[in-house]
Amino acid sequence: MNYSNIIQAIRSIIEKEEEILLNLPEEIITNRFNHQNRSIKMLLGHLIDSASNNHQRMIRLQYAPRVGHCIPNSERGMLVFPDYTQDNDLWIQLQDYQHEDWYTLVQLWKFYNLHIIQVIQSVDETKLDNYWLDYEGNQVTLHDMIMGYTEHLELHIGHIHELME
């Protein structure tokens, strides 16, 4: 499977946004909040958490013994990841992104996404149909995760830009 469009989209976002983010004044990144009560720092932290969780999923989904089957899990017999979707505000709070050094956050976001590109480029194509169960019990394939990665990234970059205005 050729994911060059996804890879190029991630690269383009990084190249475009890094400089913009690094040049934002402290007052804008910490004192403006969206409808979810998230600052720009918190939104970027959420994107780091998303990269982290998706990284784990992309790697672990390649362990599966057969295409289209879940990896055995002692609790439920299937690969089930912790419910990050329902806990992402708690992740933001516990990591205290609001008080993190901005340069560090931007660089972590950048380099985690560059690593995601490496993971996507190296994915075992025989494992693309392997899936995990989300918190609602829906099957999510490795292929679907890769295809949907930039949509989530672009969504929250858009939220950041709304707060910049």
PLM features: residue spans?
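Alpha-helical bundle segments that constitute or directly flank the non-heme di-iron/ferroxidase center
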Residues: 1-28, 49, 53-60, 148-151
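Short amphipathic alpha-helical segments at helix-loop
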Residues: 2, 39, 94-101, 137-141
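Short amphipathic alpha-helical segments, especially helix-boundary/capping motifs
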Residues: 3-6, 16-21, 31-35, 89-94, ...
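A generic "alpha-helical surface" signal
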Residues: 4, 8-11, 41-45, 103, ...
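Acidic/histidine-rich alpha-helical segments that form the ligand environment
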Residues: 9-13, 81-129
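Short, contiguous alpha-helical
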Residues: 30-88, 114-117, 121-122, 129-165
